[in-house]
Amino acid sequence: MEMDILSVLEHKFPSFSKGQRTIAQFILKNYDKAAFMTAARLGEVTGVSESTVVRFAADLGYRGYPGMKKALQEIVRNRLTSVERIEAAESTMDGHDVLKAVLRADINNLQATLDEIDQDYFNQAVDMILSAKHIYIIGMRTSTTLADFLAIYLKLLLDDVTVVKEIAAREVYEQLLRIGEGDLIIGISFPRYSKRTISAMKFARDRGARCLGLTDGKVSPLNEISDVCLYTKSEMVSFLDSLVAPLSMINAFIMAVSARDRTRTFETFRELENVWKEYEVYGTVES
């Protein structure tokens, strides 16, 4: 198993220079705060130059300081409670900068997802959706919103789509009782990963269904369970996980599925428009 950054620091500590040891010691004791610091700020609190901090990150094998910072934030996301996350973020973020900080984080998540997405995996995911006899979608906690959004549109485009709802633990498995070969389960989960989603994916896999995961990276437990797993960035600000990039990926799923059979898509929405008009589903703007 790949070591996390804290394990790497402990392992390499004896070989560090004096300045590197100072940085490493601070991070090991205060990783929750270091995860939100700029290179300049980390250099300031450790008494070394910003360039020393940047070189330190590169020596550890990261693509500059942003790469090391992301690795630290992964630790924070997986180890800290929501309250601890708030405290860590507030200790390094000026309240007046919240709006820009959140918007920048979302922009960065989208850009990182765009830079790292594997187009072949995405195409495989779309093929899995289109070839499935029955599609089950599961996402717990904040991922419920993503699962529901995906289901709304897939139900318009495809025939057999079910959202697995979190009511009680046993009822999750009851909703998956008929799943089997030829079916697909789409699992959506981000740190702190839902045990129920992971368990439901394993349940479906054991019954012969194919598994498609949407998560944040290779360290996610969904990665080992899924036949195809797509990664989107969801770097957090305080107790929040950003759902912007995951939602954008879901939008891409929906658009790709609809594009594979444009005739059916047009017919479906033409019929829906007539229904919406007849039953006054939407209001009209009077000029």
PLM segments and residue spans:
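Short, Lys/Arg-enriched, disordered terminal segments
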Residues: M1-K12, T284-S287
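Glycine-rich phosphate-binding loops that contact phosphosugars or nucleotide phosphates
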Residues: L130-S248, A252-D261
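A short, charged, Gly/Pro-tolerant segment at domain boundaries
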Residues: T263-S287
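HTH-adjacent hinge/linker in prokaryotic transcriptional regulators
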Residues: E2-L6, S15, T22, D32-F36, ...
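Glycine-rich phosphate/diphosphate-binding loops that line cofactor/substrate pockets in enzymes
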Residues: D120-A132
